[in-house]
């Protein structure tokens, strides 16, 4: 075993580097959270909400992705119910995403939506079933077509960028935005929301 001696100052800097960085990717990830025993736990994520002011074309793209996500969610939920009724089994999110890939061959309009958002809709179906079987919520229900308020989540964190009064989102490009100051950090995902009054928002999870 090799023993390395270093000054107290250098030792402190090494500890701080280990706590605040991802040693595999060598990227800054922010402070970690520790439990009562001093052991590291999952880092707390925080969401920041922005008001979006999309153009007419961007609104059409958002609404199209919302409709596609609702369609995929309802379709996968229907398949889940039929499979569970017949065999007492359920599909994983991975299996549903494979079905989604085949669906795009005969439903080409799905290709015009955010692909990551459609995959996330499959994950939402799986999570809804898991929460139901754990008795954490009721049985999953279908999303209504005429529902005014709706949202979809995209997980393309590397494609999401924020600048002063602007946010760049997958498939939409730069959109004018207003809201509080968002600190620099790794963006995990963004949820695009359309309110019942027709306003658009983005919740950025970091």
Regions flagged by a language model, labelled:
Residues 2-206:
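Nucleic-acid substrate recognition interfaces
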């Amino acid at each position: 075993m090799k023993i390395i001696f270093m000054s107290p100052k250098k030792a402190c800097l090494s500890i701080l580097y280990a706590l605040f960085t991802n040693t595999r990717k060598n990227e800054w990830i922010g402070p970690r959270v520790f439990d009562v025993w001093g052991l590291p736990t999952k880092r707390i994520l925080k969401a920041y909400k922005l008001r979006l002011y999309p153009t007419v074309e961007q609104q059409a793209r958002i609404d199209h992705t919302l409709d596609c996500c609702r369609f995929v969610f309802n379709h996968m939920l229907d398949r889940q119910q039929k499979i569970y009724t017949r065999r007492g089994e359920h599909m994983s999110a991975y299996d549903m995403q494979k079905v989604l890939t085949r669906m795009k061959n005969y439903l080409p309009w799905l290709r015009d939506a955010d692909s990551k958002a459609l995959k996330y809709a499959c994950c939402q179906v799986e999570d809804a079933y898991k929460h139901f079987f754990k008795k954490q919520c009721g049985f999953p229900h279908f999303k209504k077509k005429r529902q005014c308020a709706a949202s979809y989540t995209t997980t393309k964190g590397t494609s999401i960028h924020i600048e002063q009064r602007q946010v760049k989102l997958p498939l939409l490009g730069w959109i004018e935005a207003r809201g509080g100051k968002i600190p620099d950090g790794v963006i995990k995902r963004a949820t695009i929301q359309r309110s019942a009054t027709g306003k658009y928002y983005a919740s950025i999870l970091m």
